Amino acid sequence: GRTYRLKAYEVPEAGSRNSRGTAMVNVLPLAVGESVTTMIDLERIHEDVNLFMVTEFGVVKRTAIEEYRNIRRSGLNAINLDEGDHLISVNVTTGNQDILIGTKLGIAIRFSESDVRLMKRAAHGVRGIKLNTGDVVVGAGVLNADESEAQVFTISEEGFGKRNDAEAYTLQKRGGKGSKNFKITNKTGDVVAVEVVHNDDEVMLISEQGKIIRFNMNDIAVKKGKAISGVKTQNLDEGDKVASIAVIPGAEIEDEEAE
């Protein structure tokens, strides 16, 4: 629940794509057991935007970005977490967008960010979704209220994924129980990630054994029903599972190809 500020040139440049990289504890004063959740380019955002945070226990918080303009080298508390809770997602929002939250047991909720009042940096936050016993949040994203081209991509630990139009997720009130988003079976395993995507995006899948697979979002058909398991997106080695995914926006892919 802490925030740090770091200049890009302070991160050592990797020799190649396959390099191990530099441990974050060597560039940031992270506490034992602390890990980075989200990175935001401060040069690309304006003073009138917010940081919207979502935790594993379903707590949400909206704070003006100006609260984090003057960050000490040692960092600042961004949100006061309950014991055992972890920050899952941090997104930049405009104040009039919708928030989508997805859980491990296949539940999702969409609500207006205006349902969450602006809070000071030291605040705890409020309930974003009412979780069932044993459930936790695994992903969250931002949707424009009038956007028709966005989709929601859900993937399970065994590599089963599906893509739905964002319009399939109807607006609810903050703090509700949500609705069924994914059919979990012994074959699929639990949900590990829920992300907002677009047709021209790519997804980078990272497995527990360190395998990296990159595929086009267009390879996954858009489904009408939400409460389904989807299709096998990638074949993993026996015993391996999906650990996490990263969405690569289409605009960044075009920049790569131009280079």
Range-by-range predicted roles:
Residues 2-259:
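Short, structured "edge-of-domain" segments at secondary-structure transitions
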